[in-house]
């Protein structure tokens, strides 16, 4: 499954300042996706969580 996350502009700017570069949107190959509290969680090789407050939108595609 392919997970695409489009982060909010504020988060993108913060990441660029912190790391020097940041690609938005981020695309991940994942095994599963679910919501838990205020987080979007997915299983890649381990469980990864993103704060929903940082996300503008996201979508999943099979394949």
Where are these regions (language model features)?
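SH3/SH3-like beta-barrel fold
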Residues: 5, 40-43
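Short, mixed-charge low-complexity intrinsically disordered segments
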Residues: 43-63
């Amino acid at each position: 499954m392919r997970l695409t996350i489009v982060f909010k502009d504020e988060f993108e700017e913060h990441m660029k300042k912190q790391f020097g570069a940041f690609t938005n949107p981020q695309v991940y190959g994942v095994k599963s996706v679910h919501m838990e509290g205020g987080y979007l969680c997915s299983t890649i090789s381990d469980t990864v969580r993103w704060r929903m407050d940082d996300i503008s939108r996201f979508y999943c595609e099979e394949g």
